Curated annotation (Swiss-Prot):
Active site per the UniProt annotation: E140 (proton donor)
EC number per UniProt: 1.17.7.4
Residues that, per the record, bind [4Fe-4S] cluster: C12, C110, C205
Organism: Malacoplasma penetrans (strain HF-2)
Protein name: 4-hydroxy-3-methylbut-2-enyl diphosphate reductase
Taxon lineage: Bacteria, Bacillati, Mycoplasmatota, Mycoplasmoidales, Mycoplasmoidaceae
Gene (name only): ispH
GO biological process: dimethylallyl diphosphate biosynthetic process; isopentenyl diphosphate biosynthetic process, methylerythritol 4-phosphate pathway; terpenoid biosynthetic process
Catalysed transformations (reactions): isopentenyl diphosphate + 2 oxidized [2Fe-2S]-[ferredoxin] + H2O = (2E)-4-hydroxy-3-methylbut-2-enyl diphosphate + 2 reduced [2Fe-2S]-[ferredoxin] + 2 H(+); dimethylallyl diphosphate + 2 oxidized [2Fe-2S]-[ferredoxin] + H2O = (2E)-4-hydroxy-3-methylbut-2-enyl diphosphate + 2 reduced [2Fe-2S]-[ferredoxin] + 2 H(+)
CDD domains linked to this entry: lytB_ispH
Keyword Iron-sulfur: yes
Protein family according to the UniProt entry: Belongs to the IspH family.
Length: 299
C-alpha cells in the first residue's frame, strides 16, 4: 500500500507558543501550585506532559471557568497559585476575577481568537448584529459568546430558519477559527439568500485552513485517510469530515491502538495527516507504526 504523508500537519504556531509558555512557567515557578483552566489544547498527550511538569488541568463540563476559579484556594499568599487560561480563549470577567482574587494569571489565548474577539467588539460598537458560526459548548465558542449576550450562534444551516433579529440592524458574520471551509461556505450562502444587509469575515485560522486545503487537494488515488488527533479536537474532526465529504473512507485516530485492520482491506493508497493540536512526535510515531505494519515507506 502506498502511503502519502500530508503536509502541513502537527502543531500550529498558537499551540507551540501556548505549550512553550507552560514549560517556561513550570521552570520559573517551581514552588507554586499551577493550574490550567480548561485543556491547554485538545490533546490528552499534551495534558499528560504538562501534568509531569507539575501543571494540573482543571476542566469540568458541569462547572464554568468562573466557578473553577472560585474553587481554587490560596494557601500561601507569598506563593499564590498560578492559573493558565487555555489557547481557546476565556471570558474577560473570569480572567479579571482570577486577578482580583490574587492568583497569578497567564493567558495563552491564540492570537487568531483574540483578533476575532476584537473585531466582534468593534462591530458591536458600530451597531451590528453579530452572527457567530461555531460549535456549541466548545470553549472558543463559549468565550466568544461571553463578549455580548446579543451574539447569535449558528451551528448548522438548520439554525438559520429559527433566527429572530432586529431587521434594521446590519449583520456581521464571523466564525470559530477551527470550523471547516465547507461549513462556512454552506452557512454563509444560506445567510446571503435570507439577508440583504450582511457582511462576512472568514476567520478560519491559517493553520486550520492550510491543513484543510491539503486534505481537499489530496491526490485522487487516495482511498483511505487517517487523521491523528484527539477525540476532543474540533480541527482534527473537521479534517475527517472533509475526507468523508470527498467520499474517501476517513477515520480519526488518537493512538496506534484504535487502528483497525479492516480499514486497509482492498485499499491501495493511504493518506495520513494530523490536527493543529497533535504533537509532531505522536503523528510521526503513528506514521512509523503504519509503515512497518503495511511494509512500505513513501512520501
Amino acid at each position: 500500500m502506498k502511503i502519502i504523508k500530508i503536509t502541513p500537519r502537527g502543531f500550529c504556531k498558537g499551540v507551540v507558543d501556548a505549550y512553550a509558555t507552560c514549560k517556561k512557567i513550570a521552570k520559573l515557578y517551581p514552588n507554586h501550585e499551577k493550574y490550567l483552566i480548561g485543556w491547554l489544547v485538545h490533546n490528552k498527550e499534551i495534558i499528560k506532559e504538562l501534568e509531569e511538569l507539575g501543571i494540573q488541568t482543571k476542566d469540568d463540563k458541569n462547572h464554568s471557568r468562573s466557578e473553577i476559579i472560585d474553587s481554587i484556594e490560596i494557601k500561601d499568599k507569598n506563593n499564590p497559585p498560578i492559573v493558565i487560561f487555555s489557547a481557546h480563549g476565556t471570558d474577560q470577567k473570569t480572567i479579571d476575577k482570577a486577578r482580583e482574587k490574587g492568583l497569578v494569571v497567564f493567558d495563552t489565548t491564540c492570537i487568531y481568537v483574540t483578533k476575532t474577539h476584537d473585531l466582534i467588539k468593534e462591530k458591536i460598537e458600530q451597531g451590528y448584529q453579530i452572527f457567530y458560526i461555531g460549535v456549541n459548548n466548545h470553549p472558543e465558542t463559549i468565550s466568544t459568546l461571553s463578549i455580548d449576550k446579543s451574539i447569535i450562534l449558528i451551528e448548522t444551516v438548520n439554525d438559520i430558519e429559527n433566527i429572530r433579529t432586529e431587521s434594521e440592524k446590519p449583520i456581521f458574520v464571523t466564525n470559530q477559527t477551527t470550523i471547516s471551509i465547507y461549513e462556512f461556505e454552506e452557512i454563509t450562502e444560506t445567510l446571503k439568500s435570507k439577508y440583504k444587509n450582511i457582511e462576512f469575515k472568514n476567520d478560519i485560522c491559517n493553520a486550520a485552513k492550510d491543513r484543510q486545503d491539503a486534505v481537499i487537494n489530496m491526490p485522487s488515488e487516495v482511498d483511505l485517510l487517517l487523521v491523528v488527533g484527539d477525540i476532543k479536537s474540533n480541527n482534527s474532526k473537521k479534517l475527517v469530515e472533509i475526507g468523508i465529504k470527498k467520499q474517501i473512507e476517513s477515520h480519526l485516530i488518537w493512538n496506534t491502538k484504535n487502528i483497525k485492520d479492516e480499514w486497509f482491506i482492498n485499499k491501495k493508497c493511504l493518506a495520513i495527516t494530523s490536527g493543529c493540536s497533535t504533537p509532531t512526535w505522536l503523528a510521526n510515531y503513528v506514521i512509523i507504526f503504519l509503515e512497518k505494519k503495511l511494509g512500505t515507506a513513501n512520501d
